[in-house]
Amino acid sequence: MKVITYSSMKDFIDDTLELLLKDEAVNQLLIFTALSKKDLATNDTLHVGKVIDENNEVSLIFLNSQPYNLLAYTPNETINVDAVKLLAEYLVNNNIRIYGINACKTISETFIRYYKKLTKANFTERLAMDIMELSEVNDIILPEGNFRQATLEDLPLLSRWFCQFSLDATSELIDISIASSFMKEKIS
């Protein structure tokens, strides 16, 4: 079993995209992140790769784009614990910092268990999520009411919503004054 890394996002995409697309609903964040950085070379804050087994079969695909969470995916029905352990060891041995992990529950728990042993780091679950695939769309009748553009009167509410959404979506705390400035610019 070994970790294979890529020096460019293009090489990573060329080698893994077909496999990631087979389970696109689960891999949307990983695919989007990779494609949005497709012209970049990997560096101190961007690491991508895969773990392959002794038969050269992919056991795990990963992308770590700091300051965001490590993204990990397995194309297999069962989790290869050794692959997850090897990824944790690789990250620690290469001093690659992670801010959290986004993966299925089994991968996340296995990774955290090994990573904690190696680093004494603590993890707190911030947001557990289920991934649901939209397979059918129904027409709906919009409720009665008036929609309007936001005004500066709405700024406190919109700023709080922005901060909460950021925390929910990215586990990132945003200062309310920064959110307020951003929302004020959008309203104007």
Model-based region annotation:
Residues 26-45, 170-188:
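Active-site rim helix/loop that mediates acceptor-substrate recognition in acyltransferases
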Residues 65-144:
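Acyl-donor-binding surface of acyltransferase catalytic domains
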Residues 7-36, 40, 100-115:
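An N-terminal domain-start capping segment
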Residues 19, 37, 90, 114, ...:
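Residues that form generic nucleotide/phosphate-binding pockets
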Residues 4-5, 24, 32-94:
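Conserved donor-binding loop and adjoining core beta-sheet/short helix segment
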Residues 1-30, 137-173:
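Short amphipathic alpha-helix that is part of the acyltransferase structural core
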Residues 115, 119, 162-169, 187:
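Short, well-ordered alpha-helical segments in soluble proteins
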